[in-house]
Amino acid sequence: MTAAAAEPVTSGHRNEVYLVGEVITVPDERTFADGRDVVTFRIDVRTESESRPIRDSFDVTVANARSRKAALTWDVGDTVEIEGVVRRRFHRVGAGSRAFVVIEATRAKRLRR
């Protein structure tokens, strides 16, 4: 291995997400086409701006076993903390495809019911 190959690439780019929000759909376990088991749900994140409150909803997938197990115990209305990355996904719709964004959680925990 050369010295250049051993050094990490440092582009300055980052894909990190930290959200605290309210669960707005019942967490659902499913198996993706590639065989991965995941739990999916949506969260609502409310923030205040100077002019008005803002609500953003995010689709979240959780793949690691520990967080999947925890997410399956959550109820709509629970406040949760999500750490992860943003992923752009595609799926076929008729003759075309549709793009959507999902938060892929690497860590997820309930803060309060």
Model feature map: region roles:
Residues 1-113:
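OB-fold and OB-like single-stranded nucleic-acid-recognition modules
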